[in-house]
Amino acid sequence: MAPGCKTELRSVTNGQSNQPSNEGDAIKVFVRIRPPAERSGSADGEQNLCLSVLSSTSLRLHSNPEPKTFTFDHVADVDTTQESVFATVAKSIVESCMSGYNGTIFAYGQTGSGKTFTMMGPSESDNFSHNLRGVIPRSFEYLFSLIDREKEKAGAGKSFLCKCSFIEIYNEQIYDLLDSASAGLYLREHIKKGVFVVGAVEQVVTSAAEAYQVLSGGWRNRRVASTSMNRESSRSHAVFTITIESMEKSNEIVNIRTSLLNLVDLAGSERQKDTHAEGMRLKEAGNINRSLSCLGQVITALVDVGNGKQRHVCYRDSKLTFLLRDSLGGNAKTAIIANVHPGSRCFGETLSTLNFAQRAKLIKNKAVVNEDTQGNVSQLQAEVKRLKEQLAELASGQTPPESFLTRDKKKTNYMEYFQEAMLFFKKSEQEKKSLIEKVTQLEDLTLKKEKFIQSNKMIVKFREDQIIRLEKLHKESRGGFLPEEQDRLLSELRNEIQTLREQIEHHPRVAKYAMENHSLREENRRLRLLEPVKRAQEMDAQTIAKLEKAFSEISGMEKSDKNQQGFSPKAQKEPCLFANTEKLKAQLLQIQTELNNSKQEYEEFKELTRKRQLELESELQSLQKANLNLENLLEATKACKRQEVSQLNKIHAETLKIITTPTKAYQLHSRPVPKLSPEMGSFGSLYTQNSSILDNDILNEPVPPEMNEQAFEAISEELRTVQEQMSALQAKLDEEEHKNLKLQQHVDKLEHHSTQMQELFSSERIDWTKQQEELLSQLNVLEKQLQETQTKNDFLKSEVHDLRVVLHSADKELSSVKLEYSSFKTNQEKEFNKLSERHMHVQLQLDNLRLENEKLLESKACLQDSYDNLQEIMKFEIDQLSRNLQNFKKENETLKSDLNNLMELLEAEKERNNKLSLQFEEDKENSSKEILKVLEAVRQEKQKETAKCEQQMAKVQKLEESLLATEKVISSLEKSRDSDKKVVADLMNQIQELRTSVCEKTETIDTLKQELKDINCKYNSALVDREESRVLIKKQEVDILDLKETLRLRILSEDIERDMLCEDLAHATEQLNMLTEASKKHSGLLQSAQEELTKKEALIQELQHKLNQKKEEVEQKKNEYNFKMRQLEHVMDSAAEDPQSPKTPPHFQTHLAKLLETQEQEIEDGRASKTSLEHLVTKLNEDREVKNAEILRMKEQLREMENLRLESQQLIEKNWLLQGQLDDIKRQKENSDQNHPDNQQLKNEQEESIKERLAKSKIVEEMLKMKADLEEVQSALYNKEMECLRMTDEVERTQTLESKAFQEKEQLRSKLEEMYEERERTSQEMEMLRKQVECLAEENGKLVGHQNLHQKIQYVVRLKKENVRLAEETEKLRAENVFLKEKKRSES
């Protein structure tokens, strides 16, 4: 922002303080180029600058191929002072905070770009009193100076409260810097407050010094570390917040304005290759860069939204953006100080910072005054009326602005929509989480199922491979198994066992049950958190509160009825009380029914969940037993397979033996082969006789191949048939084992279930016995209550009879009417007294108004005194400024004296140099050319120093000229002050004269107004009295008729209620009898149920015994089967050993068929027994369900009994209420018998009213005369009001003059601050010059010290060598730098 635009901006903010800002909505961006540090000049790369400032609003970045230009609100170069930065950036925001707007100032830039210096100042010294202090201390000073000014202007009518909080965001965690012991804090959002930090300490401050103490105390707790780019680098974002609350009172109306001033020091963005960060520093840098990138994303999104695009602004991605949400596109006036490093080494970070600042400049905030108006209702109504009149006046000239109500409605609608959206978002998040959990569970299930399928496939493959391998071995090998093959078979069997174990572990049913268990637990938790349960609890609390409130109201009404004596108020209150009690009873009944329903639902749900849990537990135990059985089966299968392998080995060996031995089923050469038939018995004997003769021939004769092949084929066919039979039997056996396993699981499940049911039944028995005892006790109590109610009913009947006798007396009605008339007369007298009291009250109000007028005059005098005080303060400040100027002059004089001393030193040095030059001229012939060159270089340096001294002298002259200019300005200000004093004195004299005249005329007006008011009051009171008397007479007549009707209706209603109560009592007794009978029936049913349960338990035990028997039978059958298999093996062995023939014996097949038939019969018997057991189990389950239904029905009946008991209690309470009402009616009747009014008094009062009318007509005539006088007074008043308006205009003019003077004073103060900063800068430069002069003096001393010519030559040569060496080193370093740059380019 240009300096010339400062005053314009301030005027805009002042003019828009009481309405939403329009022009100042855009974020103000201020770019500051880092001031040079002491060590910056020595660093390589900083000598080449990449920035140049074109004007106060634009800068140029020297980029390739073309330079880029950026324009901002203000651009500060290297020589800009801290005061100018504060004046352009912070002043306007602090002023807007004073007028009720929120304000934010934050510094942005890379690490080491001067953010902390800009916001705080130098870190070495005390920032609050230092001339180079930053924006935060200066904003404290300016804020509290504005507060003091407002307090002086408003006096006691305006008060301020300032609170400070200081937090930091470190590694995306919020910490309170004012409380070092605090842990991580949290951000919350409020409709009115906005985003705020929960639990942050707020300290009240009353001055700038206290605020700075709070800041420095928190700053010491901030996390700071050193990096290669910065000695003290901020490792966190610091946010210092000042809450300003101003309260202004005017005519009992309180205007409260609250505003927030956020002063933010952001941590700088950094690159790891530049800072060389490692470990914790690297993590900190990552978190800093992440939060700053979120800030950049938010700004780009806000720019897109401003351009009309629909984008989501991700405030919640970072704690920093969420905290500064109102500052970025919200309710705040924001200024950004973009700090930039001018060195070419930081070109990338500088470019990104400038781009960020350019985007931020496009954001527009919507700042609104945070104001709340409170006060008396009458005062607020008057204010509203005044504002409406102003609006009507404005409407005649221009269109009215948009109403605030529509805005508020829009805001409220927006907030409602936002809350709904947030609720939907939370619900969707919860649903999403639950769905993700379900998906993960389903994925686990699918994985387990896939594993199960794979394991099954592997088992099938293993078995097929094993069968194929055994067949091959059987066909190919002639001997036993090799050891390698046996090992391989064992390994394969082990693999198969492992797959079976994995199959058991990843069984899908187990996973499914686990998932169902998890889902049921979640459902249980969800149902516990259901709204009906919570609502029932809330309804209980509400009903208790309502009942207590109703009881307190009824007791209060009864006390008031006892204290009062009249009949009419009781007659009005009693029906109201009756209606209220009826309503409360109805509400009670509804609430109790709802409670009972909710409790019933909750109990049912509990029972269902318990049953479900029991079933799941039983299933789990059955599955565990099934797993054990499977493991046993695995071990059995292992043993069976080992036996089968050994048997196959034996069979193979025997078959080989049979094949290799020679047979006797053929004859050699031409001998026929004998057939094995039953007809060959005789031939067999002959054959056996000649067998000894033929043995030698058979043994010596070779076996023909055809016979070998036939024998082999026969054996192979027989083996196949046997194998097929074996496989079929094995399949049947597997099926039977699988069925047995299922039966075993089912039996285990039933056993576990039966144990659980036994436990349940035992617990329910105990509960039923307890309930039975409770019911019996309740029945006894109810019987006692019934007896009590019967006695009370008899008592009530006697009372009702007495009341009927009393009610028949009609003469008492006349006495009640007379009583009412007398009460009317007393009321009329009371009202007359009230009117007189009102009259007195009005007079007191008039006196109070006079006192207020006097107070206003006193306040005007106080204002005059405050104005005088302000003038004195102005004088004091001008004196202080003049003293400061004098001090400044003295300091300038001291500087001049220092300069003179320096000049004298320079002259002395010149003289020394002249002497040296004369010596060198004498020794010119002997000296070399090199020494002359060195001397010339020394002379050039001296000339440079002299030129610098001359520049300093020129600067000093400029400072003197600026001092003269400031003195002229001060003299002109003094002259203007004197002229203003004269004008103010004249104005004050005129004001005093006008005050005296106004006071005199106001007194006359007040007296006239009072007389007029008195007359009006009298006239109005007379008219009101007359009308009220008429209305009262009519009301009394109507009330008498109403009372008669109400009495008649009351009697009828009481008769009806009495009859209803009798019927209710009879019904209650019947219900009690029914309940007793029902309880007896229930006890009988319970006993029968217990007996049935015992029977069922006996049945279950019998079934268990049968199951055990069946198990034993199955085991016996297994043993028989094994025995028969052994017999089969024995038969096979005998067939193999028999040398008669290669074929099987004829009885083998028949024996096998018989065995198979017996096995089939046994299997069918097992199936029949299984079906019978299943039928028995289903019957038992049905019986159990029937018993459960009966138990539930009995519970419902018990609940109905409890409801009946509650209804009987309610009837008793009704009886008590009716008895109380009857007592009230008796008392009213007794009171009505005592008083009798007189009708004659009405006539007397009417005559008095006629007389009053005549008197009032006379008063009206006098009033007309007074009105004419009043009009004259009003015209005079109008003239005085015009004079008052002129006076107010003059006061406003004086206020504008005062504000101008304040602004000029602030400008002078800022100029003085700038001059102080320049003075410090010049002093630093002077110190640098002194050091350089001292260095030159030392060098000269060295040169002077070397008087010997040979020593001088050696010294010069040494210097030359050092210079050459340094030049070579610099060239090497430059070459290495160029090489590294080229290497980086080639790598990129």
Swiss-Prot record:
PROSITE patterns documented for this protein: KINESIN_MOTOR_2
Domain Kinesin motor: 26-363
Keyword match Acetylation: yes
Polar residues: bias regions: 10-22
Tissues expressing the protein: Expressed in testis, colon, thymus and in breast cancer.
Subunit relationships: Interacts with MKI67 and TPX2.
Superkingdom of source: Eukaryota
Phosphoserine modified-residue sites: 568, 1141, 1169
Native source organism of the sequence: Homo sapiens (Human)
Coiled coil regions in record: 368-1388
SUPFAM superfamilies the UniProt entry points to: P-loop containing nucleoside triphosphate hydrolases
Protein name: Kinesin-like protein KIF15
Chain's gene name: KIF15
Related illness: Braddock-Carey syndrome 2: An autosomal recessive disease characterized by microcephaly, congenital thrombocytopenia, and facial dysmorphisms including Pierre-Robin sequence.
Keywords linked to the UniProt accession: Acetylation, ATP-binding, Coiled coil, Cytoplasm, Cytoskeleton, Microtubule, Motor protein, Nucleotide-binding, Phosphoprotein
Modified residues (Phosphothreonine): 399
Gene Ontology cellular component annotations, sorted alphabetically: centrosome; cytoplasm; cytosol; kinesin complex; membrane; microtubule; plus-end kinesin complex; spindle pole
Function: Plus-end directed kinesin-like motor enzyme involved in mitotic spindle assembly.
